[in-house]
Amino acid sequence: MSAIEHIRGSTWHGRKGDLKNAFRYSIDYLCLDIENAPPKKGIFKRDSGWLFGLYGSDHGGPVGDGRGAAWVRDVAAGYNIELPGKILLLAQPRIFGHVFNPVSFWLCHDAQDRLFLVIAEVTNTFGDRHSYLCKHTDLRPIQPSDRLKADKIFHVSPFQPIQGAYEFRFDIRPEKIGIWIDLQMPQGGVMATLTGPRRALSNFSILGALLRRPFGSRRVLGLIHLQALRLWWKGAKYRPRPTPPKAEIS
């Protein structure tokens, strides 16, 4: 598949425990086969331009120095995993030259076009990045009801400790996507979701996104800091940024 899809989605975050906080907002994601997608589709440009596009160097490796799908293939090879099918990248676009993706997803398919491996690429506001490998031990296809766990080892929010485990659920269908991430801790935790329909990217959909959300990921950063201020105001404990893990992926 070489089509580029535009997910006009919705994300919801809810803090669990004694100090609760929740918010929902609309968001734009792109889903594309980064190895085969066209370099240009109307206003959209891949690896060039500033208005609305996606750069491979923004993903797959260190922030700003990524290698795209080549990094994904190297990661899989390190686990002795073959990737016979397409590799889709689900990520927010660059808008007016700026991008910040709190989490992007590499969706890897088997030879029968079934999702069997996901890499959740997490980036914090300090410019650190760590990725979580989500799969079954026998590499069977990931079903919508499956729950895949990964220990949390990366600092995301200064108001959450580095403890507990993430439980991921992926419902990736031809017509829509649904992703649920449940941070489970002895006390508290966070639930985050991303849902939305899959539609073909077009100049019309891009212009709609620019009109509705003209600041793109700058808006996302602003909302993150707004929620941090709300948590601080409610009395949440602030934790300074620790040294990030040496491993790129776990």
Q: Which residue ranges define each predicted feature?
A:
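Mature, function-bearing regions of proteins
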Residues: M1-S250
